[in-house]
Every structure is written in structure tokens, then in C-alpha cells.
Swiss-Prot record:
It is found in: Cytoplasm. It is an enzyme of class 6 (ligase). The lineage of its organism: Bacteria, Pseudomonadati, Pseudomonadota, Alphaproteobacteria, Rhodospirillales. The keyword Kinase does not apply. This is Arginine--tRNA ligase. A motif ('HIGH' region) lies at residues 125-135. It comes from Paramagnetospirillum magneticum (strain ATCC 700264 / AMB-1) (Magnetospirillum magneticum). Signal peptide: none annotated. GO terms for cellular component: cytoplasm. Gene3D superfamilies: Arginyl tRNA synthetase N-terminal domain, HUPs, Isoleucyl-tRNA Synthetase, Domain 1. NCBIfam families: argS. The keyword Cytoplasm applies. Belongs to the class-I aminoacyl-tRNA synthetase family. It comes from the Bacteria. Monomer.
């Protein structure tokens, strides 16, 4: 139950009882900024004052009068110019705690997105080598966002777009051919400039030698290049999939750019736009500032991107007559739309920020306004050790591999830390700090809360065999009267709202912030028990109170596990 949604409906009912027929779409119910102000705050009187023909405070008092009769409400205050703050009965919170316990890790599951399909495309790295640390953040972000949307009830497809039609694939094929010759015993010396130098291509060369023997060695390029394009791309994709699997990242669909081109879908998309009058031959204005050396005023095939919010119209063909990347991307997004995805989310690196407007313009054009593209840009990750910039050993060319990072600190640590900042903010990843056992290390702090709960439950099972059997009912949970206990229940009851708001905003980092706050509230209660023995979770001569507190711990365990599940992180029952 999203209690804030529930009370929004109750507030709207109270408004209807006073002034029927008002537009209540702007009415909100949310946690007050200050905990001391109550449990639920609403702007109803402020946003409806004009339509109701009443002063805000007068309307607020009338709404408050109706709400005071609600059985879960113990107090209603009108604050400032007309804000309304509600205080809820302890019994209401005990019912919410029972709800958490009944649902377990399914608590927070929502039907917000029921009936809505969403395509989340992430990673989509060029298939020219292994994954590196620069790919890790977008991979984890996209995977966690997809899981968050599933938790909120959306029908999600996780997609990877394989850029296998560009000139870089020819370079990859030639690089693989060089490693093939090496596998046959030829001394290749230094890798020529323009080819990929990484050791990671050696297995591809060896596989080619095993498959063909020396048969390809003396053939002209035009005979072996077509086969090696596909072979090398497949080899690199297998490597990438292995890297992603090591990070716990998965995709449902891999879409080939070359497949789109060969199926005529690029031409089809441009024919569609031409029929709509959105493609023309023209000459672009020179770019502002210093002109690039290779810029020339020449007629080009252009898309009318400015009609859909872009700054300039965009070229669709290169000077050699081949399609631009943008033309292929238009076809790809039209293909997504025709597969039933009106809602699309693309996760890109921050260096692609200048590409956002044109892509959103293209989606508007090909979907005639029916499609929506949200582009999430992931900023750089700064790798540190002991607070200083750090470069790990490089086993694959000139970059740090994702596999190196996962081997150094573990999959779960990488995933959690990558989600502790908003995607468009720079992230520091300190190899020492992420392994510290302190509250400054969020992944440890959250996991420690989960493990501590399990430690208490194991101890309780030794005291009372049925201590962690059936979940306690409301009458037992009513023994939780300490303000810190009630505060923890309020935090747990806010999880469904957090899931929905994070899903709507496409911001999984909110889950990390919430889990940290939940862990802090739990650790605070634990520490109170060290100072005051009456607040310990287990009191041998008060079984009922102990069972109530065990119920609270079981709820904390369920919600932490639920949040970590969204992140693809396994909750631990013991710290090692």
C-alpha cells in the first residue's frame, strides 16, 4: 500500500464533500519536510483556493474538519498560508508493519505500470573489445532501472543495440586477421597503427586458424573480409556477454545495426520521413565559432529536426553517399516503436549529450508524437585508491577492463556503488573505501544492517524455537511503543511510495539513498539498545515484546532484500 496515494484519495474525497466537481489533479499528499510536522502533508487548500472561491486557510480548515473524522487520523493541523498536516494513529502504523511482514520481499511491488511496455536500451558498446570500467556505470544503471520498472509493474524489455555496420567493424576484422596469421606461426611484430592492439583478439585468431587452417592466409581481403566481419563481431559479443554476466547484467534482446541495414529498414525509415515531407536537400549554415578544417558548404540530405525541437536540421548521408550513424539510429528507433514500444529509455555515456535533441526529435517524427524517448546520460567514474587517482593493471590494450574491477572488489560492491549517485553526477569509486567496514561505505552499512538482523533472529531461535515462525499479528506488534521503533515503521511504510516515485523519475539511485536511511535508522535503534537494556531486541522475560521487535527486524530484512534485489545485489546474512 502506498499510504500517500491512499491519503491523497481520502483528501480528495474530503474536498468533494465540501466543494464538488473541482479539478484535483494538482493535489499532492507527501511526507512533510519536517518530521515534527506530522506524517502526511497536503497542498489541497493551496491549489484549490481559486476554484473553490475561498481563502486558503478557510478551505484548509474545512478540509481538516472532514479529515479529523478519519479513523486513522489522530490530529490535523493547518500550517502557514494553508498547508494541512496529518498525524496518524499508532494502530495505523502497526497495520502497515503487518502488511510488510505478510508481503515479505514482494512488499513495494506496484501496479503503477500495468499495461505499459517500456524498452530500456543500455550498454550498446561497440563490439570491438572487452568491456572497460567506462561501460560499468551505464550497464549497472540500465539493468537496475529495468528491475525498478519491473518492480513498479511495467512490462520491460532489456535491449542491446549492436553497432556492427560501421567502419570500425572492418578494422576489427583486419585486426582479427592479423591475429589469425600470428596463430599460424607468422611473426607479426608491432601492431600497425589503425588496428586494435589488444591481446583479447588472440583467441579469435586462434579460433580462425583452427577453423580454416592456412586457407585464408594468402587470399585477397575482399574474399575473407565479409566472413571475418561476422566472425569477429560474434567473438567480441561473446566476450562482452561474459563480462556483463560477471557483473550480473543481462539483456533480453540484441538488435544488429547491420541486420537493420540489410533488411532495408534504414531506407524504409527515410522513405517514411520523405513521405511526411521531413527530408530535403539543402545546405547547412556553417557551425558557430571556428570552422573545422574539413567543413565545406555542400548540398546534403537533411532531416527537419528543427520542427521537433532540435537546434539544427541533421544530415542523413555522408559525402561518400553512405548513411550517417543518425540515419541508422532513426531506423532503429522506428523499429522499436513498431515493436510496440511507445516508451523508450536509452542509457548513454555523458559524451553523447549533444546527440540527445536530434534523437528525441527523430522519435517524435517517426512516431507522429506517439513515442517518448527519455535519454539518461551517465557521467564518468573516477577510479581512486586511498583517495588518489589510480590506474589498475591493463590486460587489454589501453584501458581498465570491467573484469579487472569485478575481480578486485566483487560484483555486488561494483553494482551498489555505481548506484549511489544520480546518473548525471560524477562518481568516485575508491577501491579502498568500498571495502571499508564503516558507515562511510554505503554497501557495507546496508549489508551490515541486514546481517545484524539475521544475527538477532538466529539468537532468538535458540531462546524460543518458534521465535521466527509465523509472523506476529497487529496485537503483538502493538508492543512497539518507543519513538525510534515507530520511526523505523514509518520508514518501512514509505517503501512503496519510494519505488513508484523512483520508477516514474527513472532514478534508481533513490533506492540507494532510501536503503542507507533505513540502515541508519536500524543501527540507531541497535545502539539505543546498547545504552538502555529495555530497548534491546530480545528480552528473555518479555517474550511478547521480543516477538514484536523480531517482527520489526523481519520487516527490515524484507525491505532491504527487496531494495537490493532491484540492484541485483545478494543480501548477506553474515559479514565475513
Amino acid at each position: 500500500m502506498n499510504l500517500f496515494k491512499y491519503f491523497r484519495e481520502e483528501i480528495i474525497k474530503s474536498v468533494e464533500a465540501i466543494v464538488p466537481g473541482l479539478d484535483t489533479s494538482k493535489v499532492t499528499a507527501e511526507p512533510p519536510r519536517e518530521v515534527s510536522h506530522g506524517d502526511v502533508a497536503t497542498n489541497a487548500a493551496m491549489v484549490l483556493t481559486k476554484a473553490a472561491g475561498m481563502k486558503p486557510r478557510d478551505l484548509a480548515e474545512k478540509i481538516a474538519e472532514v479529515l479529523r473524522a478519519h479513523p486513522a487520523v489522530t490530529g490535523v493541523e493547518v500550517a502557514g498560508p494553508g498547508f494541512i498536516n496529518l498525524r496518524l494513529a499508532d494502530s495505523f502504523w502497526f497495520e502497515r508493519l503487518a502488511e510488510v511482514l505478510a508481503a515479505g520481499t514482494a512488499y513495494g511491488q506496484s501496479d503503477l505500470g500495468r499495461g505499459h511496455k517500456v524498452n530500456v536500451e543500455y550498454v550498446s558498446a561497440n563490439p570491438t573489445g572487452p568491456m572497460h570500467i567506462g561501460h560499468a556505470r551505464g550497464a549497472v544503471f540500465g539493468d537496475a532501472l529495468a528491475s525498478l520498472l519491473v518492480k513498479a509493474g511495467y512490462d520491460v524489455t532489456r535491449e542491446y543495440y549492436v553497432n556492427d555496420a560501421g567502419s570500425q567493424v572492418d578494422v576489427l576484422a583486419r585486426s582479427a586477421f592479423l591475429r589469425y596469421r600470428e596463430a599460424l606461426g607468422e611473426e607479426i611484430g608491432e601492431i600497425p597503427e589503425g588496428l586494435y592492439p589488444g591481446e583479447y583478439l588472440k583467441p579469435a585468431g586462434e579460433a580462425l586458424a583452427k577453423k580454416h587452417g592456412p586457407a585464408l592466409k594468402d587470399k585477397p581481403e575482399e574474399e575473407w573480409l565479409p566472413e571475418l566481419r561476422g566472425f569477429a563481431v560474434d567473438a567480441m559479443l561473446d566476450m562482452i556477454k561474459g563480462d556483463l554476466a560477471g557483473l550480473g547484467v543481462r539483456h533480453d534482446v540484441f538488435v544488429s545495426e547491420r541486420g537493420l541495414v540489410e533488411a532495408g529498414k534504414v531506407q524504409d525509415a527515410l522513405d517514411y520521413l520523405t513521405a511526411k515531407g521531413l527530408i530535403y536537400e539543402g545546405v547547412l549554415e556553417p557551425p558557430k565559432g571556428k570552422l573545422p578544417d574539413d567543413w565545406e558548404a555542400r548540398p546534403q540530405t537533411l532531416f527537419k529536426a528543427t520542427e521537433f525541437g532540435d537546434d539544427v536540421d541533421r544530415p542523413l548521408k555522408k559525402s561518400d553517399g553512405s548513411w550517417t550513424y543518425f540515419a541508422s539510429d532513426i531506423a532503429y528507433h522506428l523499429d522499436k516503436y513498431r515493436r510496440g514500444f511507445g516508451a523508450m529509455i536509452d542509457v548513454w555515456g555523458a559524451d553523447h549529450g549533444g546527440y540527445v535533441k536530434r534523437m528525441q526529435a527523430a522519435v517524435k517524427a517517426v512516431s507522429e508524437g506517439g513515442g517518448d524517448l527519455d535519454v539518461k546520460l551517465c557521467q564518468m567514474v573516477n577510479l581512486l585508491k586511498g583517495g588518489q587517482p589510480y590506474k589498475m593493471s591493463k590486460r587489454a590494450g589501453t584501458f581498465v577492463t570491467l573484469r579487472d574491477l569485478v575481480e578486485a572488489v566483487g560484483k555486488d560492491v561494483v553494482r551498489f556503488i555505481m548506484l549511489t549517485r544520480k546518473n548525471d553526477a560524477h562518481l568516485d569509486f575508491d577501491l579502498d573505501k568500498v571495502l571499508e567496514q564503516s558507515r562511510d561505505n554505503p554497501v557495507f552499512y546496508v549489508q551490515y544492517a541486514h546481517a545484524r538482523c539475521h544475527s538477532v533472529m538466529r539468537h532468538a531461535a535458540g531462546m524460543w524455537p518458534d521465535a521466527v515462525g509465523p509472523v506476529p499479528g497487529v496485537e503483538v506488534l502493538a508492543h512497539l511503543t518507543d519513538p525510534a521503533e515507530l520511526g523505523l515503521i514509518r520508514l518501512l511504510a514509505g517503501w512503496p511510495r519510494l519505488v513508484e516515485s523512483a520508477a516514474e523519475a527513472h532514478e534508481p539511485h533513490r533506492v540507494a539513498f532510501y536503503l542507507y536511511d533505513l540502515a541508519a535508522a536500524f543501527h540507531g535503534l541497535w545502539n539505543k539498545g546498547k545504552d538502555d537494556t529495555s530497548l534491546r531486541f530480545l528480552i528473555e522475560d518479555d517474550r511478547e515484546l521480543s516477538l514484536a521487535r523480531l517482527g520489526l527486524l523481519r520487516a527490515v530484512v524484507g525491505v532491504i532484500a527487496s531494495g537490493l534485489g532491484i540492484f541485483g545485489v545478494a543480501p548477506v546474512e553474515e559479514m565475513r
